[in-house]
């Protein structure tokens, strides 16, 4: 059974990643109304008779979301039953399921009540939490923490501050990026790093949205760079923290490069999808570090208790 659960966890993680990228594809191609204002049916039909490209993209996104719902539900039930001895399993199972349901409801709301940029941005943010929760659940199932000896990990307050702070801030940056996409502001500023050669400062809403996201992205790049330097200097003996920050910096660098290329490739589809891919992976890695941070507090208490008993 455990072998089956491992395969299920991998397939579920991939399915949720496809859902995230599918949502970006729907937005990029303007396929949000490919099934009209009908949900869960498509144009009022179970199998739509008129299959335009927009309809195919939107319908495919709904089907992958539906399959993800089934897989996540099954994974939550089985992990709860067979891995309940692991402290975070129940919490992650609940988060995975609750945010998947919330994601589906937000998607339905976007279809029925209109493609409001704020609603669509929230839809992506909720999807990201569901994806990260399933990734963490998968890590627990594969016992990644044991391979890195994470159970003995103890971090100082400074490192935990950076982990929690960067993760929360990353989530806020995600919303600024989602707002850029849903406000159709990806090409509002044709140059980089300034908005335009003729007028470096933004002058209208779409330019402010674009430049606000750029400033937020630059700050998270600098913050992750600083945290990585701290990890390299002080956590070489803790490979999970050491490599966690290095991987985070690689991902945020790739994210930045792709973000710049979005501007210079006229917001090509490939760049837009890669932009969504890298931020999804970055957020998942940061969430894993958060989980390690919560464990560190427990490990520190246990170590202190053991030290008192030996004395």
UniProtKB/Swiss-Prot annotation:
Recorded GO MF terms: metal ion binding; oxidoreductase activity, acting on NAD(P)H, heme protein as acceptor
Membrane topology: Multi-pass membrane protein
EC number: 1.17.99.9
Membrane-spanning segments: 7-27, 63-83, 92-112, 122-142, 160-180, 212-232, 244-264, 272-292
Catalytic activity: Fe(II)-heme o + 2 A + H2O = Fe(II)-heme a + 2 AH2
Disulfide bridge positions per record: 35-42, 189-195
A cellular component annotation (GO) from this entry: plasma membrane
Primary localisation category: membrane
Binding site for heme b: 213, 275
Residues the record lists as binding heme o: 61, 123
Topological domain spans for side Cytoplasmic: 1-6, 84-91, 143-159, 233-243, 293-311
Metal-binding keyword on record: yes
Cofactor(s) it depends on: heme b
Extracellular compartment spans: 28-62, 113-121, 181-211, 265-271
Active-site residue numbers: 58
UniProt keyword annotations, A-Z: Cell membrane, Disulfide bond, Heme biosynthesis, Iron, Membrane, Metal-binding, Oxidoreductase, Transmembrane, Transmembrane helix
Domain comment quoted from the record: The N-half (TM1-TM4) and C-half (TM5-TM8) domains are connected by an intracellular loop. Each domain is formed from four-helix bundles and they align in a pseudo twofold symmetry manner. The N-half domain is the substrate-heme O binding domain and the C-half domain is the cofactor heme B binding domain.
Subunit structure: Interacts with CtaB.
Record PANTHER family: HEME A SYNTHASE
Function (record text): Catalyzes the conversion of heme O to heme A by two successive hydroxylations of the methyl group at C8. The first hydroxylation forms heme I, the second hydroxylation results in an unstable dihydroxymethyl group, which spontaneously dehydrates, resulting in the formyl group of heme A.
Family indicated by similarity: Belongs to the COX15/CtaA family. Type 1 subfamily.
Protein name: Heme A synthase
Organism: Bacillus cereus (strain AH820)
Organismal lineage: Bacteria, Bacillati, Bacillota, Bacilli, Bacillales
Gene name for this UniProt entry: ctaA
């Amino acid at each position: 059974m455990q072998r089956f659960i491992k395969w299920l966890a991998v397939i579920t993680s991939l399915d949720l990643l496809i859902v995230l990228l599918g949502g970006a594809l729907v937005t990029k191609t303007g396929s949000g109304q490919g099934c009209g204002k009908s949900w869960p049916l498509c144009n009022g039909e179970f199998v739509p008779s008129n299959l335009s490209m927009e309809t195919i993209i939107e319908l495919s996104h709904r089907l992958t979301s539906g399959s993800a719902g089934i897989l996540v539900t099954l994974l939550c039930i089985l992990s709860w039953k067979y891995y309940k001895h692991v402290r975070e399993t129940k919490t992650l199972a609940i988060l995975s399921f609750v945010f998947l349901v919330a994601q589906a409801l937000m998607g339905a709301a976007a279809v029925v009540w209109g493609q409001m940029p704020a609603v669509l941005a929230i839809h992506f943010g909720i999807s990201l939490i569901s994806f990260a929760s399933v990734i963490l659940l998968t890590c627990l199932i594969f016992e990644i923490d044991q391979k890195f000896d994470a159970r003995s990990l103890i971090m100082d307050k400074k490192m935990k501050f950076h982990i929690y702070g960067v993760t929360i801030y990353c989530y806020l940056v995600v919303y600024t990026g989602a707002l850029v996409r849903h406000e159709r502001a990806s090409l509002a500023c044709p140059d980089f790093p300034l908005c335009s050669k003729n007028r470096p400062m933004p002058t209208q809403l779409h330019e402010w949205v674009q430049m606000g996201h750029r400033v937020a992205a630059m700050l998270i790049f600098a913050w992750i760079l600083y945290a990585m330097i701290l990890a390299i200097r002080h956590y070489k003996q803790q490979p999970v923290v050491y490599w966690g920050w290095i991987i985070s910096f690689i991902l945020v660098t790739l994210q930045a490069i792709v973000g710049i290329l979005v501007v210079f490739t006229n917001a090509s589809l490939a760049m837009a999808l890669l932009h969504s891919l890298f931020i999804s992976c970055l957020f998942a890695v940061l969430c894993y570090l958060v989980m390690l941070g919560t464990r560190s507090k427990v490990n520190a208490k246990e170590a202190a208790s053991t030290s008192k008993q030996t004395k």
